[in-house]
């Protein structure tokens, strides 16, 4: 018997990702990127809930079911409202009782 997973709503996933980003960015981003993000976030910043990619296995070395995770990007958007400078991509489990996450940081 399989149990239905209650998926994160986009706003909750965005809040979780942004909180993690703020907590961990200082340890994982170059100081220049942190400065850029802080200076431009108010004008160009974005935190976007996106369709969960199926290539996370290549990034994290673990096969995942895209239906069990939400994907959120944190970065800066350009004049066309496209996120062209991604500082972090988050993969967040929909399982509330066992909330795990993976992050790909800008290199």
Curated annotation (Swiss-Prot):
Pfam families: DUF440. It comes from the Bacteria. InterPro entries: dsDNA_mimic_put, Put_dsDNA_mimic_sf. Monomer in solution. Interacts with the DNA-binding protein HU. May act as a double-stranded DNA (dsDNA) mimic. Probably regulates the activity of the DNA-binding protein HU. HAMAP family: Put_dsDNA_mimic. Contains many negatively charged residues, which are arranged in winding patterns on the surface similar to the charge distribution seen in dsDNA. The secondary structure elements are arranged in an alpha-alpha-beta-beta-beta-beta order with the two alpha helices packed against the same side of an anti-parallel four-stranded beta sheet. Belongs to the putative dsDNA mimic protein family. This is Putative double-stranded DNA mimic protein HI_1450.
């Amino acid at each position: 018997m399989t149990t239905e997973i209650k998926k994160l709503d986009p706003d909750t996933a965005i809040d979780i990702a942004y909180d993690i980003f703020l907590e961990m960015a200082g340890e994982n981003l170059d100081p220049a990127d942190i400065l850029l993000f802080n200076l431009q976030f108010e004008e160009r910043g974005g935190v976007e809930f996106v369709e969960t990619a199926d290539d996370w296995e290549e990034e994290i070395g673990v096969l995942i079911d895209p239906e069990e995770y939400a994907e959120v990007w944190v970065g800066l958007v350009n004049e066309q409202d496209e996120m062209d400078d991604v500082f972090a991509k988050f993969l967040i489990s929909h399982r509330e009782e066992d909330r795990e996450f993976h992050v790909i940081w800008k290199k």
